[in-house]
Design a protein with these regions (language model features):
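Glycine-rich beta-alpha junction loops
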Residues: 22, 37-44, 193-195, 215, ...
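Conserved C-terminal alpha-helix-loop-beta "cap" of PLP-dependent enzymes
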Residues: 287-377, 381
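Short amphipathic alpha-helical segments
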Residues: 59, 85, 224, 253, ...
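Conserved PLP-enzyme active-site core in the AAT-like
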Residues: 4-10, 17-23, 86-287, 292
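N-terminal glycine-rich, Lys/His-bearing helix-loop that initiates the first secondary-structure elements
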Residues: 1-58, 404
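Conserved N-terminal alpha-helix of the aminotransferase class I/II PLP-enzyme fold
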Residues: 40, 45-95, 120-127
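PLP-dependent enzyme catalytic core of the Aspartate aminotransferase-like
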Residues: 2-3, 126-127, 135-137, 156, ...
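Acidic-histidine catalytic/liganding microenvironments
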Residues: 81, 282-286, 335
Length: 404
């Protein structure tokens, strides 16, 4: 959704990020919502307990593994940001992924997923869910339109990312939603790289949205969290799964998440603007063989990004170095400001080597499908001054061709 586009309630995403989900009347007139650290909640009478047990007090709190007021507030905020009926936050993005998938699948079911998926997701599909006889089949982005003929009688879900980690391949959301509906399968997107500031997949017809809230939602690299957004009926199933496996979010982390969300719109825009400047600089650098960034006019997904990502290319830039691991090592070791670390979406610029991070342990075939090689480097661009980021990257690149 455009950053100034209004929600059904008439509020723009930047306003929802600040005020969404919050109760206007707080105890003692507090401007900031309190943090409810309590692990359990009492009842005034035995009759209240009985009514809660019978499901007659849906807004009551009982035990924080099931629900907590601080957690509920951030869930309402994220649901409104995505334009969904309901949301559930979890202890990590991986927990959100597992619960989103397991909530609808049973033994014998099949999940079709894009082969350009985050490494952790691939391992959940192939190493964890497979233990419950839930199988995964991987297809290319180009094959999504053929979902109705690709699916089997066992296919229950379709999972994909857009933009995809790490080289920013985009999926046409309208096409994917139509293909999933025609195939009669439930569609879930990992929209972590985009955030609802850039795109709202539910408005295109995608059934559910997952985010690693550790990233842009938190925005300060100081928490781990995940979230799933969709219809009330579906989210009830995901919430039930999360509470049963203990994947719910701690209220202290929920408070940090809510605080981070308040600056989401401005942080995402700043990151996108810096990313475009960095990507343009990298295209002119002789030590860079290729730049992957859909905000560049010569990128194959540029027009799609203009259409469905509010005209931005996102906050992640990937490159292929003119070289391999030895050149990558010299580059990483020469950086002075940019930090070598996994993750993304924080205020600081990070650089990672997918071969040894998000896609470690992948087979050569899997790496080719994901577009990852020994030359691939991913930048998660922060909100520092763009010239400082570029200067640091360029001085480090200048040393990749040097030998001792």
């Amino acid at each position: 959704m455009a950053s100034d586009e209004q929600s059904k309630e008439g509020r723009a995403s930047a306003t929802i990020a600040v005020h969404g989900g919050e109760h206007r009347e707080q105890p003692f007139g507090a401007v900031v919502s309190p943090v409810y650290h309590s692990s359990s909640f009492g009842f005034q009478t035995f009759d209240e307990l009985r009514r809660y047990a019978r499901g007659e007090l849906s807004d009551a709190y009982f035990y924080s593994r099931y629900a907590n007021p601080t957690v509920s507030e951030v869930e309402r905020k994220i649901a409104e940001l995505e334009g969904g009926e309901s949301a559930v936050v979890t202890s990590s993005g991986s927990a959100a992924t597992f619960c989103a998938l397991a909530a609808l699948c049973e033994s014998g079911d099949e999940i079709i997923a894009c082969e350009s998926s985050y490494g952790g997701t691939v391992k959940i599909l192939t190493e964890l869910l497979s233990r419950f006889q839930i199988t995964a089949r991987f297809i290319s982005i180009e094959e999504i339109a053929r979902l109705p003929e690709i699916r089997s009688e066992r296919t229950r879900l379709f999972w994909f990312e857009s933009p995809a980690n790490p080289i920013n391949r985009l999926v046409d959301l309208d096409m994917a939603a139509r293909a999933a509906r025609a195939a009669r399968v439930f569609s879930i997107i990992d929209s972590t790289f985009a955030t609802p500031v850039l795109q709202r997949p539910l408005s295109f017809g995608i059934d559910a949205v997952m985010h690693s809230a550790t990233k842009y939602f938190g925005g300060h690299s100081d928490l781990t969290a995940g979230v799933v957004v969709g219809t009330e009926d579906y989210i009830d199933k995901v919430r039930h799964m999360a509470s049963r496996v203990g994947a719910t979010l701690d209220p202290a982390a929920a408070y940090l998440l809510g605080r981070g969300l308040k600056t989401l719109a401005m942080r995402v825009r700043a990151s996108c603007e810096n990313s475009l400047q960095l990507a343009r600089a990298l295209t002119r650098n002789k030590m860079v063989a290729r730049v992957y960034y859909p905000g560049l006019e010569d990128d194959p997904d540029y027009k799609l990004a203009r259409r469905q990502m509010n005209g931005f290319g996102g906050g992640v830039v990937a490159i292929d170095l003119a070289g391999g691991e030895p050149e990558a090592e010299r580059f990483f070791d020469a950086l002075r400001i940019v930090k070598c670390a996994p993750s993304l979406g924080g205020v600081e610029t990070l650089v990672s080597y997918p071969l040894y991070s998000s896609h470690v342990g992948f087979s050569d075939e899997q790496l080719r499908a994901a577009g990852v090689s020994a030359a691939t480097i991913r930048f998660a661009v922060g909100i520092e001054d763009a010239s400082d980021i570029i200067n640091d990257v360029e001085q480090a690149l200048a040393k990749t061709g040097q030998t001792d």
